[in-house]
Regions:
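Long, charge-dense accessory insertions within large macromolecular proteins
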Residues: 62-88, 106
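Hydrolase catalytic cores
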Residues: 1, 136-200, 206
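Residues that cap or initiate secondary-structure elements
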Residues: 48, 60-62, 123, 138
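Beta-sandwich interaction modules
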Residues: 18-59, 67-72
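Broad hydrophobic/π-residue packing in well-ordered secondary structure
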Residues: 50-53, 117, 143, 204
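Charged/polar, solvent-exposed surface patches and flexible loops
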Residues: 97, 183, 187, 211-214
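Extracellular S/T/G-rich loop segment that most often corresponds to the catalytic His/Ser-adjacent loop
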Residues: 1-2, 6-31, 84-165, 211
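Carbohydrate-binding/catalytic loop surfaces
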Residues: 201-215
Length: 215
């Protein structure tokens, strides 16, 4: 068990254990540069197997205070590491929460199901993200089929280019902006009848360019 940690502005503390090889480094950032919120990074080296529990205290921790915690991406972790009670929501990554960016999750276009490895919204402070969902499972490429958010992002980028062609090159709406593209795609997104929208998984629905132009 570690003693209670007290932080100064931007301080880092490190702990070792007498009978274990585990080393823990905790870095406190009083103001995270993108949000202004407090950020704490906890790094484990050679962690001992078992359940690790963190107790948060502070002079200004109120009943309505919200604490969010995430694991590092799987490719940066070693061994089996997971939360006992995980929450799949609020798992979009930077820069997904940029206001004017078109943010997409991905789904299987063969059966219409949301893909379990895709991130989900909303934002920590309630921002409506993602904007929509795009196909991202077993997408055909010159190197074979691939799955992932990068596939959905690429398809959506192509949709944005198609919309820009119609708006600017064909002079239908030459003043289109990034926010405007976001709005057009969201309005044209196809909803699933069983979902409440905007959705943490689907945003405003599935990417549908025909419906976007019809709208």
């Amino acid at each position: 068990q570690l003693p209670e940690v007290e932080f100064g502005l931007g301080s880092t503390v490190e702990y070792t254990f007498v009978y274990e090889k585990t080393r823990i480094q905790i870095t406190d950032t009083a103001n995270e540069r993108n949000t202004g919120d407090q950020l704490m990074l906890i790094r484990f080296t050679a962690p001992s197997p078992g359940v690790w529990t963190f107790l948060i205290r502070g002079a200004r921790v109120f009943p309505e205070s919200i604490f969010d915690i995430w694991l590092a991406p799987q490719q940066f972790r070693s061994g089996e590491l997971f939360f006992l009670v995980p929450d799949p929501d609020v798992t979009l990554t930077v820069p997904s929460y940029t206001t004017d960016a078109v943010t997409v999750t991905f789904f299987n276009s063969e059966n219409g199901s949301f893909y379990y490895r895709s991130g989900r919204g909303f934002g920590r402070t309630g921002e409506i993200k993602p904007d929509l969902a795009a196909p991202g499972v077993e997408i055909s490429t010159v190197n074979g089929p691939y799955s992932g958010s990068s596939m959905a992002a690429a398809l959506t980028a192509g949709a944005c280019a198609q919309l820009m062609q119609w708006c600017v090159a064909e002079n239908n709406y030459s003043r289109i902006s990034g926010r405007g593209i976001q709005t057009f795609l969201s309005r044209g997104a196809r909803e699933q009848t069983q979902e409440e929208y905007p959705s943490r998984r689907w945003g405003y629905g599935q990417l549908d360019m025909r419906r976007t132009f019809d709208e």
